[in-house]
């Protein structure tokens, strides 16, 4: 069953925070404070300066999901579920309490931060060599494994699912493939043009498709098909507008191409193959929906923005959601809200039902709608919590491996692996404000996202 109007935030960490907490990313500080890359020009864009520790050494702030947040993993653990996070975490990479096993996951495998090299398992950050760090772990200990990250995550999912036959508990397994996030590393056996980024992306996508098939098959082969809800979706749009068609925009924009995602659900007896549903759903809605399906407790200290969509998804009726706040003031993106058929992005208004490609600004002829939506998104922005106390800093400033406990006793093989990667990295930051790599050839970057297609010059 396909959801035709499923939405997320426009970048990865905010979406993951909303998925795990049922709350808009601005409430958890995840809408832009998910990671400090240490690039002065990028920090300046956020109104920050490069952090220094008490010894005067430049370092990075620790940004992570607040441990006071209740995650869906914790809620399902309370309901008696086995919980596992396989793949990308991106909600804290340093202190143990911020890592998956400190946030409700019994089993962890994969990487903590944002864009890992699929072969070396290092986070290079498109940054000076000193920032390269190893980021591949099993149960929060460094894992030395050869192979392509997408394949390794699929293999771990197969092992974890098979092991559930010896465990009477129901399970929640969050498989967060890094593909097709950069860097562009073609999978094994790639026979296309190594200088063609689109050919590499297509190969990475095919590899992802095969990996998802392996996970689905593992569920079926181990006898869990009929009582398992299997969901496939994404955390944000693509980096190229060409890949967003028919929608406009890219990742890191709140155009439809940045926030509208594919969403496929399979639950035999509850979803009908080949069908689709019209109606709004936001990624945070999975939080209360999962708790209802698991027979868990909805009561908690912090209110959620997610809406229980159990009845709409698996029974008759309509979606209960009529509003989505994609970004509010204080973000690096335009305040954007959708209410019903209308979406306001800054001063621009679109009727998404009539104009899903967002080609016609109707703000001038719908001033009443603009006023109403602006008042609403402004009101939500005023609910943003303060930054809080003095930020935590990463120490040592330039670790070999993510995870403060893992850095305390780094094995020789890991040090050598990181040194080898650092020897090939540039010594200084690339020009520009963003810490991300330049857009590949053929990119059509939106004016809103702050990125420049340097290759077009």
What are these regions (language model features)?
Residues 106-107, 111-117, 238-243, 248-256, ...:
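C-terminal cap/loop subdomain of S1 sulfatases and analogous C-terminal strand-loop tails that border
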Residues 1-17, 22-27, 82-84, 103-112:
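Short, structured active-site-proximal loop/turn typified by the sulfatase FGly-forming signature C/S-X-P-X-R
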Residues 95-104, 183-188, 193-198, 217-270, ...:
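Histidine-centered active-site microenvironments of extracellular/periplasmic hydrolases
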Residues 12-22, 93-100, 120, 239-242:
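Pocket-flanking alpha-helical
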Residues 7-11, 59-70, 143-153, 196-211, ...:
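A short beta-strand-to-alpha-helix junction
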Residues 1-4, 78-84, 103-106, 166-173, ...:
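Loop/turn elements at helix/coil->beta-strand transitions in domains of secreted/extracellular proteins
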Residues 35-82, 91-169, 177-188, 200:
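Formylglycine-dependent
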Residues 2, 286, 333, 339, ...:
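Long, internal low-complexity/basic segments
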């Amino acid at each position: 069953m396909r959801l035709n109007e499923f939405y997320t935030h426009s970048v990865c960490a905010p979406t993951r925070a909303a998925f795990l907490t049922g709350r808009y990313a601005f409430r958890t500080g995840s809408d832009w404070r998910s990671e400090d890359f240490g690039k002065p020009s990028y920090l300046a864009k956020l109104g920050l300066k490069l952090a220094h520790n008490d010894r005067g050494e430049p370092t990075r702030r620790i940004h992570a999901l607040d441990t006071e947040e209740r995650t869906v993993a914790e809620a399902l653990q309370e309901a008696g579920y086995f919980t596992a996070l396989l793949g990308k975490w991106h909600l804290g990479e340093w202190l143990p309490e911020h890592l998956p096993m400190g946030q409700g996951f019994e089993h962890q495998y994969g990487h903590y931060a944002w864009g890992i090299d699929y072969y070396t398992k290092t986070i290079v950050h498109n940054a000076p060599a000193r920032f390269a760090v190893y980021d591949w772990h099993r149960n929060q200990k460094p894992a030395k494994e050869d192979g392509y990250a997408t394949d390794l995550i699929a293999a771990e999912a197969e092992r974890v699912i098979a092991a559930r036959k010896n465990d009477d508990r129901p399970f929640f397994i969050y498989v967060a493939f890094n593909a097709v996030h950069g860097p562009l590393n073609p999978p094994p056996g790639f026979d296309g043009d190594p200088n063609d980024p689109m050919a590499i992306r297509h190969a990475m996508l095919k590899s992802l498709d095969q990996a998802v098939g392996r996970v689905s098959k593992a569920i079926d082969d181990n006898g869990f098909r009929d009582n398992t809800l299997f969901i496939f979706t994404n955390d944000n749009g693509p980096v190229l507008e060409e890949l967003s068609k028919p929608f406009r925009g890219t990742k890191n924009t709140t155009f439809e191409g940045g926030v509208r995602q594919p969403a496929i659900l399979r639950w035999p007896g509850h979803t009908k193959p080949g069908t689709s549903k019209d109606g709004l759903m936001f990624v945070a809605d999975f939080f209360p929906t999962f708790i209802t399906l698991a027979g868990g407790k909805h009561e908690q200290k912090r209110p959620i923005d997610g809406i229980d969509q159990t009845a709409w998804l698996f029974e008759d009726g309509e979606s209960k959601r009529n509003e989505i706040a994609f970004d509010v003031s204080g973000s690096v993106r335009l305040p954007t809200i959708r209410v019903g058929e209308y979406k306001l992005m800054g001063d621009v208004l679109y009727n998404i039902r009539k104009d899903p490609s967002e080609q016609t600004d109707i703000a001038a002829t719908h001033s009443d709608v603009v006023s109403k939506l602006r008042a609403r998104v402004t009101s939500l922005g005023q609910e943003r919590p303060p930054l809080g106390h003095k930020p935590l800093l990463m120490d040592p400033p330039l670790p070999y491996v993510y995870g403060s406990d893992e850095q305390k006793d780094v094995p020789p093989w890991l040090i050598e692996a990181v040194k080898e990667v650092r020897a090939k990295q540039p010594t200084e930051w690339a020009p520009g404000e963003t810490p991300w790599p330049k857009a590949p050839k053929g990119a059509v970057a939106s004016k809103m996202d702050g990125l420049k297609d340097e290759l077009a010059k």
